[in-house]
Amino acid sequence: MTAHLGGEDFTLLPDLAVRPLGGSVIWANDEFFAEKENLINPGPAEYQPSTFGHKGQVYDGWETRRHRGRPGDDSAVVRLGVPGVIRGIVVDTAWFKGNYPPEVSVSALAIAGYPPAGEIAARTDWVPLLDLVKVGGDARNPFPVDDENRWTHV
């Protein structure tokens, strides 16, 4: 599936969150099975069968416990490598076949400076870019975004 916004395939645009561009995952409420930094790895997700680390099977993605014995959603905060207009979001669940989130949402902030990560995560002025939507497992799930604002965090 190729998503178009104004005739432009947003997946051909630069990934503002990717690590080589300076993106960083500054906060996550859980990373029990796989590290949050995997969210910003460049290129397609990789998987090698029978590779185990101290947290279990090694995946190129962020994996949480999901059922933690407390209410609430899993969330992470990514500081974009460069602030910019977000034309689309790809939720890549490659290699996650039974352990992927059934639905996701993405919100954004534009903030100056470098306040502490916990303060950023706790803010209540996040702007929804992608309302709660269903995603498939082991797939690239692209969603166009129709928003002209410049963002620093998702």
Give residue spans per PLM region:
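Extracellular and analogous surface-interaction loops
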Residues: S75-R87
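Trp- and acidic/polar-enriched beta-sheet ligand-binding modules for extracellular glycan
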Residues: T2-S75, F96-V154
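A short beta-strand element within beta-rich, extracytoplasmic domains
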Residues: G84-F96
